[in-house]
């Protein structure tokens, strides 16, 4: 089995090293194509206004000056020799990718691009506990459980237009409670904010900030599973259509387009 690895934390990220260990537990045919620089929050961005440059680190390891989506496209179309990959693994991300964050995630986007190119794809993320003074990433947890989960998923299979999103709780392996197949959750509070600061020349600038606060996630969601110490496996569908609203709107907007009132 030929496996392509990518991420959004960059070619030197410890999570990519963890992912390589995971992949090599499954196959000896592993290729790595990751961003030269961190691309967290890049989502499915493409590099359109600049040339994409590639640095070859060894025969099967490449750093790309671009996004995770660029990396997967570049690897499949130009860099991998002898055939397309059978599996794309994206991660292991430093921090969870659950709930509404999946639409921002470059890690999930790398898996989506693999799916778009007809390759079974899985995103993997390692949660961290931001409520503690010392934030620790338990890469050993992802390394311990990911190979078995991936193998089981490959045995069962999944639809061609679905990607698997796997999140490991912020716990050492011996404290993980179970694996749970979940749906995508939604937080009950907005966590992002813009932090305004002033430089030494009196000019304002801003940093994107995140508020670490507890949520009350619904049963069966990725949020609930990870918060309670379980591994979350969520099948994600690229079709974002809300079918209930489609049904409602058809009764209101079907037929001739409405004109402005009073026109």
Curated annotation (Swiss-Prot):
SUPFAM superfamilies with a match to the protein in the record: SurE-like
Binding-site residues for a divalent metal cation, renumbered to this chain: 8-9, 40, 93
Cofactor binding, per record: Binds 1 divalent metal cation per subunit.
Entry's EC annotation: 3.1.3.5
Cofactors that this protein relies on: a divalent metal cation
Pfam families for the chain: SurE
GO MF, one example: 5'-nucleotidase activity
Catalytic activity: a ribonucleoside 5'-phosphate + H2O = a ribonucleoside + phosphate
Record keywords, A-Z: Cytoplasm, Hydrolase, Metal-binding, Nucleotide-binding
Keyword Ribosomal protein: no
GO cellular component, as recorded: cytoplasm
Coiled coil region boundaries: none
Described function: Nucleotidase that shows phosphatase activity on nucleoside 5'-monophosphates.
HAMAP family according to UniProt: SurE
Family classification: Belongs to the SurE nucleotidase family.
UniProt protein name: 5'-nucleotidase SurE
Originating organism: Caulobacter vibrioides (strain NA1000 / CB15N)
């Amino acid at each position: 089995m030929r496996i392509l690895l990518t991420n959004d934390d960059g070619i030197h990220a410890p999570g990519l090293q963890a992912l390589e260990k995971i992949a090599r537990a499954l196959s000896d045919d592993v290729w790595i194509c990751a961003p030269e620089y961190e691309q967290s929050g890049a989502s499915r961005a493409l590099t359109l206004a600049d040339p994409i440059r590639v640095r070859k680190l060894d025969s099967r390891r490449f750093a790309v000056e671009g996004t995770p989506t660029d990396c997967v496209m570049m690897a499949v179309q130009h860099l991998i020799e002898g055939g397309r990959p059978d599996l794309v693994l994206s991660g292991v991300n430093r921090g969870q990718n659950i709930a509404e964050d999946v639409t921002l995630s470059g890690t999930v986007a790398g898996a989506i691009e693999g799916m778009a190119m007809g390759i079974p794809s899985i995103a993997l993320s390692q949660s961290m506990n931001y409520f503690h003074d010392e934030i620790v990433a338990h890469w050993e947890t992802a390394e311990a459980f990911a190979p078995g989960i991936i193998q089981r998923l490959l045995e069962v299979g999944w639809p061609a237009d679905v990607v698997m999103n796997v999140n490991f709780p912020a716990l050492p392996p011996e404290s993980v409670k179970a694996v749970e197949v979940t749906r995508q959750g939604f937080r009950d509070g907005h966590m992002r904010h813009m932090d305004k600061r002033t430089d030494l020349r009196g000019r304002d600038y801003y940093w994107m900030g995140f508020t670490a606060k507890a949520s009350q996630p619904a049963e069966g969601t990725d949020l609930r599973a990870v918060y309670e110490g379980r591994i979350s496996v969520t099948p994600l569908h690229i079709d974002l259509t809300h079918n209930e609203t489609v049904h409602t709107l058809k009764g209101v907007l079907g037929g001739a387009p409405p004109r402005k009132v009073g026109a």
